Amino acid sequence: MLADTPGQKDRVFLILTGVWLFTALFLFGNPVILDYLHPPKSVILGGESPSNVLRYLGILAVLGLACVLGFSRLSKPKLRLPAGVPKWLAWLPAAWLGWQLLSFLQTENQAMSQATVIHFASCLVAFYLGLFVLGRMRLAKLALWGAMLGLMLNLADARIEKFGGLEQTRNNIIEQIESGKLDPATLAPKAHDAGNTIPTKIEKQIAALPPGTAAKVRQLPIELVKRMYSSRLYGRMFYPNALAGLILLLLPVSLALLIGQGRWKIPRAAIALGLAAVGLACLYWSGSKAGWLIAIALLGAWFLHLPVPKKLKLGLACAAMMLGLAGFAVKYADYFDRGATSVGARFGYWRAAVQTAMEKPLLGTGPGTFQLAYKRHRAPGAEPTRLTHNDYLQQASDSGWPGFMLYAAFIGGAAWVLARRRLDDPVLIAVRLGLLAWALQGFVEFGLYIPALAWPAWLMLGWLLASPINWFDKSVAPE
């Protein structure tokens, strides 16, 4: 039989969990409420893309099967909290989901909120799977190899984009326009481009096309034109900043898994070196400014874990961060000279979220409905958006201040508990660094709403909380 012994059954569960993670990174890089907005290389121009409902139900079924198999392997009591995990922290996510359900009852858009609540529920399932199941399994790290393979696939796709893939995509769209297969006029009504113009740099490239083709390209939605002519990489993710978030979340643990104890040390070290080089290059090519800054913070935090004298660790960390900031200043000097438009746009989103939370402080407008609230507060000429680009403030807008406080208390509480632990296992240290990056990026992005980012983050968070404790200050360690 496939799994006759307890050890074999554990392996089946871990492999199934790894398959779930790999599939999430392969197929579910879009926000749950933006499933019809794809990168140009995969969009069917002229119409909305086919629904992902069946695939989504399939991946949820795999997650459900993993839960049944995983919890069946546990001895009673099955919901016994691991040592060192406060009860209030363990059950805060359940309270947060409960509040989302209350908000759902009065939502302004049932379809958006239903998709969001189902996604949030799947995140909680992943968290408790890590907390109660992975935390008790000796071979738990095996499941993370699926996430590592998914990261490698995204990086391979991004590398192809860098070396001709993006240009080929652009040329294919232009060929469709010239052949008549694509009529830009059918897309223009969807663009919502009032007050927006094509950037000067892109306009120069369009002007180099034949006059008739150039005129038709200008009729395309401006957002699509920007994507066509962008040099930023996104792999299989929704957009470049999401790829940066994926790299920051999973590259540290992937390297730790490869370099860790085991056979074939030299080949694994060589693969790790190549993965690090490609990962950092793709992070740079993604053009994510927040990603660069978070990477600097992670590098400084990693230096603090080195087994060297404290003064040397601090010196290395400070030097690395100063060099990184200097590089950032040089790289993006022109961006800030032009007014840092994306930063200004985000402040507009955040202002609208706070205004909505003030208007509906108890239950908000409903999970995942910021797009509707933003339309009421959007300044003339401001960029449209469907998400707040801040996971924390979106809770306030969508589910009121109680939803915000529950989510912020959970993420902040988990950070506080994990910061007090001294970790010796390189894989656990890498997981903590990746989760730190995910939590920080949540202040400027929407990783909570992207399954490929949220699922591995919640799973690893539960597993890390359940990991063996080694407290900095044992006098205050919980009983």
What function would you assign to each model-found segment?
Residues 38-57, 82-86, 113:
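Interfacial loop-to-helix junctions that mark the boundaries of transmembrane helices
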Residues 104-105, 360, 377, 381:
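A short secondary-structure junction motif
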Residues 2-31, 55-73, 86-105, 110, ...:
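Alpha-helical transmembrane segments of multi-pass inner-membrane proteins
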Residues 33-51, 221-236, 344, 348, ...:
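Juxtamembrane membrane-water interface segments that cap and precede transmembrane helices
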